[in-house]
Design a protein with these regions (language model features):
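Amphipathic alpha-helical assembly/interaction segments
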Residues: 1-131
Length: 131
């Protein structure tokens, strides 16, 4: 169930981690769909290298988010996810610099990555407050 329905008790923090994870998961899924349509337009010569690495980082990020949802101690997993998010930003910048994507696509992907970053940052902050 990867939807935005609230779970747990809103009066307390119960279920807050699950909601954060589900929202980030949904936003990442939306980003994946958009990136997959973008990668079709990349030069054929870049698909086995650059695009494959980009996909690997995206899937690794997704893996960390799913893992963090399932773990009791989430802080290090979320920090690992944050590193992967930085790599996604770097690959987006490179895609634009190498002219694989136009400015409109670059800005749209950047906005989505920033939104995911804000959500992830809030989740990390909530974990630091717990410890």
């Amino acid at each position: 169930r990867y939807d935005n329905r609230p779970r747990g008790n809103p009066e307390t923090d119960e279920g807050m981690d699950q909601r954060n994870g589900l929202i980030i998961l949904q936003k990442t899924k939306d980003l994946m769909q958009y990136l997959y349509t973008s990668w079709v337009k990349y030069p054929k010569s870049e698909k086995p290298g650059f695009v494959a690495d980009y996909k690997k980082i995206l899937l690794e990020f997704l893996k960390y988010i799913i893992t963090a949802q399932k773990k009791y101690y989430k802080k290090t997993t979320l920090q690992d996810a944050d590193v992967q998010l930085e790599l996604l930003r770097l690959f987006n910048d490179l895609s634009y610099d190498l002219k694989f994507i136009d400015e409109k696509r670059y800005l749209l992907i950047s906005d989505r990555l920033c939104e995911i970053g804000r959500l992830l940052g809030g989740w990390i902050k909530s974990q630091k407050e717990k410890s």
